[in-house]
């Protein structure tokens, strides 16, 4: 059943749309307001010509001066809208990538005519939705492409620049055409839906967290909800010097304009300590979930190794706490848009979602389960919520083995293990051959699962440890040992998909803007094991993320490693594995200390989020497993600075 907030919102949209359509017309007293001309059969339908759509480019004024030149920043906005007197809502994507790096699987850029007016937009949103009575608005983020100012990587300048566009669309701002004429948004109802993947989806989260009026819905795809959770892993930097580098990677201003701003970003990020400070707090949208007025449709890869899944889960939980209308799509691929995973189902969902939240059409999209989740390649399930209802933490003990693997079970923990930091340890070495004795990692194995086990939520590992150095990274990896067909989410630049030779079309095309896109498929391999989840933490942040507190060598401490959230079924007969190590230079950029660490297993535990039965028992000795990683499976390299 649709919740009351959703029904009230949709009713209000329908009323406003009808009134705006009838401005200047005299309706019969008893007649029902007719729907807009592009609504038929309970949905928007292709009505307007995409080829003859209005295409215009404007500069929106802001109150920002992010480049400190004494002149307010302006934001470049490109618009494609139906040629009609009927006011229409807006689908908007703000991005830093329109001129530098491209959008979508085919890395498309904006293209302009000789007068500087938009000619071709990336992606299919304009092709598909403009004929159906929507405008599509593409915003160049401050400091990029044709906008002025300097970007601040998810900070007040970037969020404020996009918020200014929402304000203008609702009559609260000013803008000009490129020839200086005043641009007025009299063609829109003012209802805006933001969408975008990665950094673009992050902007949707950030603008929604301001509570700006007129933003009715957002669709963040692989979006960041906290830049600390993107660039730091509980105190461990993923890459050094990253904020300034990232701002520079998308910088569209004349050389040198933003150098000082970018240097300040890197300094404020504080690589030295890894602390969560005011810089990161200004880029953390989760605490402001209570300000969100928009509904939220989240899509995220559970195995996204660019924007880790913690970014969706913390945001989802905060939105739930404040009763924000929301739905969630989860898949097993990496940093990928659902358009390239389950294209037909995703476009159907977007169509219904925007019809409901922007047009006020009561189509039932908010009914039924909140979550659609892919738990294995192309095996989608509906789920009432995330984590799955009834999921609870199951605490398992760890015990030492006789020089090889230790055990995971329901009995008591015992023994100790010693670890020596090895910055050259690869993930394949760490999780492969789990029974082999190694000084740089410890492995623990369960009995064979007696039935299918459903993991849904965030695993954690709590360790009692001592170190001979004042600081060290601690790494934990949860592994499913057993042969199965698994998505290779590391393939093709962490996407997990590959192109086919065919194309499918979504909307109308012109000679300059095709609506046809390469079809794709998931990269799937049969493997003997799969890493379910990873987690990292810094020993000097064991008491909190705001203060670097070195450990006293030789003293015992307790620390909890939060792994990334997951939702997956473990098959009967498989073995659950836990791998604990120190530095992980394939995923992070720690200051490797060469520490020697001892773990007290009697006071260490693995906590699994299990929905239903656990199907694990006690085990006296670790099972002997033989596993082989296929040569075709993608491998990692030293972590590079990459674009979100």
Q: Would you name each region that the model predicts?
A:
Residues 45, 64, 72-73, 77, ...:
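Accessory cap/linker subdomain of secreted extracellular hydrolases
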Residues 35-44, 343-644:
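C-terminal, loop-rich substrate-recognition/catalytic regions characterized by aromatic stacking residues
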Residues 30-108, 112-115, 122-125, 135, ...:
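Catalytic-loop region of hydrolases
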Residues 130-146:
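Conserved alpha/beta-hydrolase
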Residues 2-32:
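Secretory targeting and sorting signals
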Residues 145-166, 173, 338-346:
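Catalytic nucleophile-loop/oxyanion-hole region of alpha/beta-hydrolase
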Residues 305-311:
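Conserved alpha/beta-hydrolase "acid-adjacent" motif
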Residues 292, 298-300, 304:
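Short beta-strand/loop motif that positions the catalytic acidic residue
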């Amino acid at each position: 059943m649709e919740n009351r907030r959703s029904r009230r919102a949709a009713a209000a949209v329908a009323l406003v749309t009808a009134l705006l359509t009838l401005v200047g017309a005299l309706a019969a007293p008893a007649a029902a307001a007719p729907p807009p001309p592009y609504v038929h059969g309970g949905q928007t339908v292709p009505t307007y010509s995409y080829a003859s759509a209005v295409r215009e480019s404007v500069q929106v004024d802001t109150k920002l001066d992010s480049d400190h030149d004494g002149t307010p920043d302006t934001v470049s906005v490109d618009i494609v809208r139906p040629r009609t007197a009927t006011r229409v809502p807006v689908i908007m994507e703000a991005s830093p990538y329109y001129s530098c790096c491209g959008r979508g699987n085919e890395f498309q850029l904006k293209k302009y005519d000789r007068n500087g007016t938009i000619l071709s937009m990336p992606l299919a949103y304009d092709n598909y939705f403009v004929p159906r009575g929507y405008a599509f608005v593409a915003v160049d983020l401050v400091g990029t492409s044709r906008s002025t100012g300097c970007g601040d990587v998810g900070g007040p300048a970037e969020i404020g620049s996009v918020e200014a566009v929402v304000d203008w669309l609702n009559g609260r701002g000013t803008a000009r055409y490129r020839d200086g004429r005043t641009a007025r948004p009299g063609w829109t109802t003012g209802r805006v839906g933001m969408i975008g993947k990665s950094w673009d989806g992050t902007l949707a989260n950030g603008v929604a967290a301001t509570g700006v009026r007129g933003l009715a819905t957002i669709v963040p795809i692989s979006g960041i909800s906290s830049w600390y959770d993107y660039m730091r892993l509980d105190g461990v930097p993923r890459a050094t010097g990253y904020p300034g580098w990232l701002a520079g990677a998308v910088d569209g201003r004349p050389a040198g304009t933003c150098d000082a701003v970018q240097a300040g970003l890197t300094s404020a990020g504080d690589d030295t300590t890894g602390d969560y400070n005011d810089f990161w707090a200004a880029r953390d949208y989760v605490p402001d979930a209570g300000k969100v007025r928009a509904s939220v449709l989240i899509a995220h890869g559970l195995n996204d190794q660019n924007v880790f899944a913690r970014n969706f889960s913390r945001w989802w939980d905060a939105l739930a706490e404040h009763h924000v209308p929301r739905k969630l799509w989860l898949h097993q691929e990496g940093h990928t848009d659902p358009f390239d995973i389950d294209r037909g189902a995703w476009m159907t969902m977007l169509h219904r979602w925007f019809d409901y939240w922007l047009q006020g059409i009561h189509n039932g999209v908010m009914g039924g389960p909140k979550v659609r989740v892919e738990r294995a390649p192309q095996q989608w399930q509906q789920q009432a919520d995330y984590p799955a209802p009834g999921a609870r933490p199951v605490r398992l003990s760890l015990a030492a083995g006789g020089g090889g693997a230790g055990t995971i079970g329901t009995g008591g923990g015992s023994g100790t293990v010693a670890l020596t930091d090895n910055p050259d340890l690869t993930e394949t070495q760490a999780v492969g051959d789990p029974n082999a004795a190694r000084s740089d990692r410890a492995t623990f194995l369960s009995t064979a699962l007696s039935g299918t086990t459903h993991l849904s939520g965030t695993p954690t590992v709590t360790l009692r440890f001592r170190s001979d150095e004042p600081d060290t990274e601690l790494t934990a990896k949860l592994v499913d040992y057993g042969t199965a067909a698994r998505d290779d989410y590391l393939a093709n630049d962490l996407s997990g998909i590959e192109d086919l030779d065919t194309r499918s079309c979504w909307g109308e095309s012109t000679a300059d803007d095709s609506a046809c896109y390469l079809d794709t498929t998931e990269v799937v391999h049969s493997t003997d094991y799969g890493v379910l989840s990873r987690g990292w933490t810094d020993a000097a942040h064991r008491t909190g993320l705001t203060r670097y507190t070195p450990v006293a060598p030789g003293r015992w401490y307790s620390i909890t490693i939060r792994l990334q959230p997951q939702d997956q079924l473990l098959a009967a007969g498989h073995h659950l594995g836990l791998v604990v190590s120190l530095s992980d230079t394939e995923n992070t950029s720690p200051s490797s200390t060469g520490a020697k660490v001892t773990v007290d297993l009697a006071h260490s535990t693995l906590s699994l989020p299990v929905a239903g039965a656990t199907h694990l028992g006690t085990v006296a000795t670790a099972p002997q497993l033989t596993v082989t990683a296929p040569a075709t499976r993608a491998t990692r390299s030293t972590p590079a600075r990459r674009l979100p």
